[in-house]
Amino acid sequence: MAQRVTYRRRLAYNTRSNRTRIIKTPGNNIRYLHIKKLGTIPRCGDTGVPLQGIPALRPREFARLSHNKKTVQRAYGGCLSANAVKDRIVRAFLIEEQKIVKQKLKQLSSQK
């Protein structure tokens, strides 16, 4: 007859937070091993692509990390992807160029 196993925590329902695996201990007992939930990969705020260089952890574990493991060394590092930052820089540059052109045209029209 198979050995019976019971949950090792108080929660007695088969929920996502109570997932288990059956393992065999060195003492040859069969026991439930509670599995931790997987963390989600941080994503870019603009494009929604997964961020490179930042681990997928649960919120509590992520809060315990040191600062340099939560970010990458770049503007908006840890919030936006590299392509999104590049697009923002190019867009800002083009807008500034457009402002300068508009200003020059205004000066030329006022001189005439």
Swiss-Prot record:
Transmembrane segments: none annotated. Component of the ribosome, a large ribonucleoprotein complex responsible for the synthesis of proteins in the cell. The small ribosomal subunit (SSU) binds messenger RNAs (mRNAs) and translates the encoded message by selecting cognate aminoacyl-transfer RNA (tRNA) molecules. The large subunit (LSU) contains the ribosomal catalytic site termed the peptidyl transferase center (PTC), which catalyzes the formation of peptide bonds, thereby polymerizing the amino acids delivered by tRNAs into a polypeptide chain. Keywords: Cytoplasm, Ribonucleoprotein, Ribosomal protein. The gene is rpl3401. Gene3D superfamilies: 6.20.340.10, 6.20.370.70. GO terms for biological process: cytoplasmic translation; ribosome biogenesis. It is found in: Cytoplasm. The keyword Ribonucleoprotein applies. Component of the large ribosomal subunit (LSU). Mature yeast ribosomes consist of a small (40S) and a large (60S) subunit. The 40S small subunit contains 1 molecule of ribosomal RNA (18S rRNA) and at least 33 different proteins. The large 60S subunit contains 3 rRNA molecules (25S, 5.8S and 5S rRNA) and at least 46 different proteins. GO terms for cellular component: cytosol; cytosolic large ribosomal subunit; preribosome. This is Large ribosomal subunit protein eL34A. Belongs to the eukaryotic ribosomal protein eL34 family. PROSITE patterns: RIBOSOMAL_L34E. One of its GO terms (molecular function) is structural constituent of ribosome. It comes from Schizosaccharomyces pombe (strain 972 / ATCC 24843). InterPro entries: Ribosomal_eL34, Ribosomal_eL34_C_sf, Ribosomal_eL34_CS.
